[in-house]
Amino acid sequence: MKYCFFYIIGLSLIMSVLFLMLCVYSSQCSWKQIKELSVQRGYFITSKNYTSVSRSREFGDLTTQSCEPLHPRVVFYNRIFKSASSTMSSFFKKCSKRLGYIFTKDFTEEWENENISHPILTRIQAQIARSKKLNKKLMAVAHLYFREDIDSAYINLLREPVARFISHYYYCRSPNRYAHKLKRLKELGHFNVTIEKCLEKQYEGCVWNHMTRFFCGPQAFCKSGSDEALAAAKHNMLHYYASVGIMEYINEFVMVLHKRLPDFVLPPPRDGMRKKKVTKGVTKNGISESTRSMIINANRADIQLYEFAKDLLFKQALNCGIKIVT
């Protein structure tokens, strides 16, 4: 009878753990629900929302806004749409030729994806393994949402949220895009919609709180723009990123990166970082104040995250001895 009792307890514990694992990896539960469930079951699952994860010192973090030079083997730039990502990628490619590291650039994770695994992630991890065999440093670049298990120092760049949203709307309708993407947009009937309609329906290029998702992750709750998603994004920014910048101060950000990651980043050009224009062939119209208000209201998490990142950049620049004129 005694053994039967322990058998039942053990089986219950195993089933609870399996349920939690299914919950996490299927993204059907939020981290808050997971925490509550863990307490109910009598044990605790640590989530990245609530605790710091111990990592190698070579990766650094932003908890102290330190300017201490880091020498990681791998840097990952999980770039955000319409935030000078083409400009930065081109610059890093030039840096790689001068500094002798491997530069690899991959594609875009779909907004609809909610799985931890992804083909882009698999390819990046394969590149990391290859670079180690070659005893070379690596910079990987991709439009990929944050993953905890990429063994690298993260960097990223944000943009003023309203300007980024408007730019993304027009970019998705630019003839400069891949033909198959434009064809899909037209087949769905989303190509000629107004920015107001695109915002309301969250069509491609108009999803809400886009930047927050890149720092939060692929999980379903990261798409919501909720307080929980914002908290996770801020946590990851603090604990996994060597530096974050904002597009409006791109030259100062590159100066910080040069001091922070000297093996990967050269000083900015003397005449400054020249923004690469990728949205061509479209006429950008002004927006009304009511439309601007709609964009702001829909992207509250992005606005708060942008201000948070701006504050971190200014503090890190100060520690680097770099003056930012506002």
Regions found by a protein language model. Give the residues of each.
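N-terminal initiation segments
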Residues: 2, 74-79, 83-85, 105-109, ...
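PAPS-dependent sulfotransferase catalytic domain
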Residues: 44-64, 109-157, 163-269
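A detector of helix-start/N-cap boundary segments at the beginnings of structured domains
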Residues: 62-64, 74-79, 241-244, 292-293
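Catalytic nucleophile-elbow at a beta strand-turn-alpha helix junction centered on a G-D-S/GDSL motif
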Residues: 79-92, 161-163
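PAPS-dependent sulfotransferase catalytic core
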Residues: 214-223, 232, 266-326
